[in-house]
Amino acid sequence: MEDSYLHKGLRRKLIKILRDKGIQDELVLQAIDRVPRHIFLDNAFLEHAYQDKAFPIGDGQTISQPYTVASQTSLLKLSPGMKVLEIGTGSGYQCSVLLEMGVNVFTIEYHKSLFEKSKKMLQSLGYKAQFFCGDGSEGLARFGPYDRILATAGAPYVPQKLLEQLKVGGILVIPVGDQKTQKMLRLTKVTEKEITQEECGDFRFVPLVGKDGWNAKTNKL
């Protein structure tokens, strides 16, 4: 699918909207400006691709609102070369933004159909990440520890295994709450035994499913 001058112009307008909403990290804004969001949407939503809204992508999942992507990415405090675990590949849009930040991404998706679709999409765009299909609520221990971990689905609590897979000095950004709204948390691993936690606003995500998340069939713990 073409990334036209029209699309690029719409992205510039989106960047202005994000700035007006308080996103200040210019490197994050530049990364979002480089990612063709319309390519990640179903045809029915193409004309709305650069609105600051979330849209369905199948399997009960959504492509996140650009403000949410910008906010979470900013909270990570990324530097090029970092090793980042993304929990919930979804459409692949957030993963693309992370890759545009120059980090090494390991991304895991619970839903097989989305895993296959997003892997194919990102590879066709020339993005290089490590893709996995499985229970992201348990992380991806065999490739850890990670400098940063990002969860793109709402968890009922902070999974201990994610903290264990974080390097000392590392940051975990994860939305935690019920299935209606969550608090965005930023946890910093100061030492192996000391974790600091910040609350960074209210958001609404699809449920994180898995052993340390919500039950995929019943949507209960």
Curated annotation (Swiss-Prot):
Q: Which gene encodes it?
A: pcm
Note one Pfam family from the annotation.
Answer: PCMT
Residues the record marks as active site: 64
For the keyword Methyltransferase, the answer is yes
> To which protein family does this belong?
Belongs to the methyltransferase superfamily. L-isoaspartyl/D-aspartyl protein methyltransferase family.
What protein name is recorded for this chain?
Protein-L-isoaspartate O-methyltransferase
Which GO cellular component terms are attached?
cytoplasm
What Gene Ontology molecular function terms does this protein carry? Answer: protein-L-isoaspartate (D-aspartate) O-methyltransferase activity
Question: Is Methyltransferase there in the keyword field?
Answer: yes
